[in-house]
């Protein structure tokens, strides 16, 4: 069901109103940059890599956890579907969410990911696992568009696509490396169990949430007032 949802967009596409594109204002953030701001780009890439790595713990390890809890095997598929459905949800009400959390939006999003992972690592109840998948997906889906938007800002219009390609590349890198990083950690620490990946990344994410709270005025971890002041 989740994977058929893009068909809704295709069906509605003929009803979109076409507007002629207007030049970027000379005073915009993009036009102030002559080249890509590499330090900011690297920090955005690192942040995107980590939240992707942490959130994808659910997709890689939920099946093992569900099996260990002796729940129906199909339930892991339900959890993963809910996770991806929750990733889509913030885009529908993004402005409202930013209006509520304002400068703490990234803090809240990272905290949601961490809380979702802890739900998997601590609770055995089906309801809490559903809550965990929804929280982690919602937090991840909230941060994605913000990272993409910040990436576009740090580059002039002619280089914005290149900057975005670098950021999106680390998404696939995180997908590829996630199981290897977690398995390496478990081998080095001799910690084993179906809950370990969730508790490990839950603690790492909690640490990042604390850092984001302390550095909420930072370009990467914070959110500029221009996002919520009209």
What are the residue ranges of the model-derived segments?
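A late C-terminal transmembrane helix in Major Facilitator Superfamily
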Residues: 154-190
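Intracellular helix-loop hinge segments at the cytoplasmic ends of transmembrane helices
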Residues: 63, 145-154
């Amino acid at each position: 069901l989740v994977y058929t949802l893009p068909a809704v967009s295709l069906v509605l596409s003929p009803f979109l109103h076409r507007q002629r594109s207007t030049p970027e204002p000379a005073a915009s953030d993009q036009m102030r940059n002559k080249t890509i701001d590499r330090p900011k780009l690297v920090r955005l890439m690192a942040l995107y890599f980590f939240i992707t790595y942490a959130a994808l713990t659910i997709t890689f390890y939920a099946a093992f956890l569900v099996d260990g809890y002796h729940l129906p095997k199909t339930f892991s598929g339900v959890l993963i579907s809910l996770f991806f459905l929750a990733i889509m949800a913030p885009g529908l009400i993004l402005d409202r969410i930013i209006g509520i959390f304002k400068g703490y939006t990234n803090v809240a999003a990272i905290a949601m990911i961490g809380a979702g992972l802890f739900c998997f690592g601590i609770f055995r109840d089906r309801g809490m696992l559903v809550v965990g998948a929804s929280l982690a997906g919602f937090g991840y889906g909230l941060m994605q568009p913000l990272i993409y938007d910040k990436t576009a800002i740090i580059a002039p219009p002619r280089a914005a696509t290149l900057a975005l390609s670098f950021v999106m590349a680390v998404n696939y890198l995180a997908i590829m490396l996630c199981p290897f990083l977690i398995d390496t950690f478990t081998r080095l620490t001799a910690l084993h169990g179906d809950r370990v990946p969730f508790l490990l990344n839950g603690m790492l994410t909690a640490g990042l949430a604390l850092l984001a709270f302390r550095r909420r005025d930072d370009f990467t971890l914070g959110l500029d007032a221009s996002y919520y002041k009209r």
